[in-house]
Amino acid sequence: MDRSRTSSQGRDVLPPRGDEGRISPSLDKEKSPGPEDQPDAPPDGGLTAWLVVVGAWCTSFCSFGWVNSVGIFQNYYESHLLKHLSSSTISWIPSLQIFFMFAMGPIVGKLYDTFGARYLIIGGTFFHVFGLMMASISTQYYQLLLSQGICSAIGAAAIFQPALSAVSAWFNRKRGIAFATLSTGSSVGGVIFPIMVDRLIAKVGFGWSMRISAFMILFLLGIAIVTVKARRPPPQGPKPSGVQLLQPFKEPVFIVTLLGYMLLTYGVFIPINYVIVQAVASGMNADLASYLVPMLNGASLFGRLGAGFMSDRYGRYNIFIVMCIVAGVLVLALWIPATSNAPIIVFATLFGFASGAYVSLSPALIAQISPLKEVGYRTGLLFLFASVGGLTTSPIAGAILQNAGGDYTHMKIFSGVMLLGGTAFIITARIVGTGLKLVVKY
């Protein structure tokens, strides 16, 4: 891929930027026409554009913010509602949530490219809220699988991805910080939901804690329905052919990025799902352990903002790679030996910060290497590949834990290796796109 970032067929993937090939703009005095010079260039700001980001923030809060709280439900189900079942069996509930949120990607992406964002968000709001309401009256394992693991997750997929794709159309030069800003919604949700649900379960019971959460989500998604919209009407031309749908799989940078992101999914969600359970098993007070996921997600907020800001300056792939390497090293060097309160808390905080780029920069990576009109579909493909990891991460981790007789070391090693292995694929994608150039902004 050359510096103008064209696909193998020579199509324009992203308008060239004058500073694209360098860390410092001053090193490249000859500036090529930027996106602001193009007739249909994204405005990169303005009230409407930032209102789209506000609405997308609400969808992030209600989708990934909710899913980032799965650790609190894993712990509650193991100790109360489903305590007669094994950890590996219970873990299929959060695994299905993650799977359907990601696996619906290509379907939601094509629906967005055809119909725009608003109708998808309306439909997604219904399924997300309805699923949580049904979970509030569930008492059996299969009922929770259907309501929380499938119905709610399908709704969450239909609200989040259209918002991401809509933001891509409104921003180009500031795309990194725009994505980082909206992705902080999942961090804030990941802080608020675990604490809120934990306290509500103690005071009003599991049923009403789910209903109150559903009403809160309904209110925020009402804001998203009003504010999130596409910048241009959906195209009215013929439907894309099979050849066009397969085109992304002919682009090496895109394929390697998909594979890397899938492996990263295995590594990222194991700490999120198991940090509370492992801390309690190591002797941490259950009340203190319940704050670990909020700590992780709170630190992730700053990691996402920092990664987004730095990515616009130094390159999205570059910053994504650095952050993922740090996350993998933290798992292997800090989480494995962590058996007391202090190192576990430090790990949760630092890992939350380092893993923030996994959510905030992944859509920006795809937008960078894709034609704007295909961003929805290609982002969906990214999520589809990630869904494989999302579906199998917790069951694999639970099986590793069970085979090790309750020793968490092997599970932690698996998480760290997947993080570094996925990062190796992303590094390969960067090399394919730029060659062996360390200082290239990419």
Swiss-Prot record:
**Which ranges are annotated Basic and acidic residues under compositional bias?**
17-34
Stored Gene3D superfamilies: MFS general substrate transporter like domains (1.20.1250.20)
What do mutants without this gene show? Leads to the production of a mixture of ferriaspergillin analogs with varying combinations of aspergillic acid and hydroxyaspergillic acid.
Q: Which CDD domains match?
A: MFS_MCT_SLC16 (cd17352)
Q: Name one GO molecular function term.
A: transmembrane transporter activity
Sequence similarity: Belongs to the major facilitator superfamily. Monocarboxylate porter (TC 2.A.1.13) family.
Q: Which protein is depicted?
A: MFS transporter asaE
Species whose genome carries this gene: Aspergillus flavus (strain ATCC 200026 / FGSC A1120 / IAM 13836 / NRRL 3357 / JCM 12722 / SRRC 167)
